[in-house]
Amino acid sequence: MNDVLDLTCDLIARASVTPEDAGCQALLAGRLTAAGFACEHLRLGEVDNLWATHGSGAPVLVLLGHTDVVPPGPREAWTSDPFDPQIRDGVLYGRGVADMKGSVAAFVVAAEQFVAAHRAHAGTLAVLLTSDEEGDAIDGVRRVANLFLERGQAIDWCITGEPSSTERLGDLLRVGRRGSLSGTLTVKGVQGHVAYPHKARNPIHLAAPALAELVARQWDDGFESFPPTSLQVSNIHAGTGANNVIPGELQVAFNLRYTPHWDAPRLEAEITALLDRHALDYALRWHRSGEPFYTPEGRLRSVAREVLGAFAGAPPEESTGGGTSDARFIAPLGAQCIEVGPVNASIHQVDEHVRVADLQALPALYRTLIERLLIE
């Protein structure tokens, strides 16, 4: 094995199911401290966060990652124990190897190598880690970003190690993410016998026209590299289970993934107005997961395009697809944000894995990005 493999395996062996860190950050802080970084442990609620810096002043480049993982599911479904890293046929298996302990290990190795070669580098190189990315994402980077605002901590560039690649390492550069807004709609009716509909008010029938209008609406035509805003109904529930009872209440869960054309308050107002037009007796609860962010052409994006193109052998696709990431909390600080990481084909799945060759290449990729941004 080599250093990044050893470190990745050490991290996988720590069963840090969100929001647990299981000692990952202490291990990483020990290495970063030995390399000359100043490390600050931020315990917020039940969540561990680590802020490590080397150098001072601008520009500030942050390597952003998380040490928590999603639950592995049934252990018997895995070919080997999810927290016992195994290499088979040139592939490393284990929960979190792709999302994103491999990237975190590569960050640390790259940071160690960079500061060893450039002790007096310009600006600040920082590593920010949390154990609350896969869970509620309340006491992790969201709260740390608020703390940075209070401190006046500026961030110029942020590289998140989310698994962005699709087929081969470096084939995709994530330059933004859509916003995410979830709603839970409760429509009230009057329960009754199906044989006497005039004595009841069926909330399914009452809500159907409004729901049809919601799902048929074209919210926008997309933006730059963003696909159009999408509303998806994810759950509908009503009734007692008996086929002779008109339900007294309908519950509908839905989610919007939206472009920078919108923000959460405007979407909430649009949907509330639509429901009001249909004269429904309803209650609506919202959950804002994050606003969209987009990194336009600039130094970070151009450098990343060149570096990934050299590693992958072709210019990367530049995309804003996928789910949310913690970069959504860093972008509002004024930072340009990108995501660069390993192939994402197996994330959150049984037998999560990364090619060993890709993992071995990651530190050099990250180090090259750091050098291009802080040295040139």
Swiss-Prot record:
Q: Does the keyword Zinc apply?
A: yes
Write out the catalytic residues in the record.
D68, E133 (proton acceptor)
Q: Which GO terms describe its molecular function?
A: acetylornithine deacetylase activity; cobalt ion binding; succinyl-diaminopimelate desuccinylase activity; zinc ion binding
Give the protein's function. Catalyzes the hydrolysis of N-succinyl-L,L-diaminopimelic acid (SDAP), forming succinate and LL-2,6-diaminopimelate (DAP), an intermediate involved in the bacterial biosynthesis of lysine and meso-diaminopimelic acid, an essential component of bacterial cell walls.
Amino-acid biosynthesis listed as a keyword = yes
Q: Give the record's cofactor note, including how many are bound.
A: Binds 2 Zn(2+) or Co(2+) ions per subunit.
Q: Which domain of life is it from?
A: Bacteria
Family annotation (PANTHER family): ACETYLORNITHINE DEACETYLASE (PTHR43808), N-ACETYL-L-CITRULLINE DEACETYLASE (PTHR43808:SF31)
Indicate what this protein is called per its UniProt record.
Answer: Succinyl-diaminopimelate desuccinylase
Which residues bind Zn(2+) 1 per the record? H66, D99, E162
Which GO BP terms, alphabetically? Answer: diaminopimelate biosynthetic process; L-arginine biosynthetic process; lysine biosynthetic process via diaminopimelate
The UniProt similarity line reads:
Belongs to the peptidase M20A family. DapE subfamily.
List, alphabetically, the InterPro entries matched: Bact_exopeptidase_dim_dom, DapE_proteobac, Peptidase_M20, Peptidase_M20_dimer, Peptidase_M20A
The UniProt keyword set, sorted, is: Amino-acid biosynthesis, Cobalt, Diaminopimelate biosynthesis, Hydrolase, Lysine biosynthesis, Metal-binding, Zinc
Pathway connected to this protein: Amino-acid biosynthesis; L-lysine biosynthesis via DAP pathway; LL-2,6-diaminopimelate from (S)-tetrahydrodipicolinate (succinylase route): step 3/3
Question: Which organism encodes this protein?
Answer: Xanthomonas oryzae pv. oryzae (strain KACC10331 / KXO85)
In this chain, Zn(2+) 2 is annotated as bound at D99, E134, H348
Q: Could you tell me what reaction this enzyme catalyses? A: N-succinyl-(2S,6S)-2,6-diaminopimelate + H2O = (2S,6S)-2,6-diaminopimelate + succinate
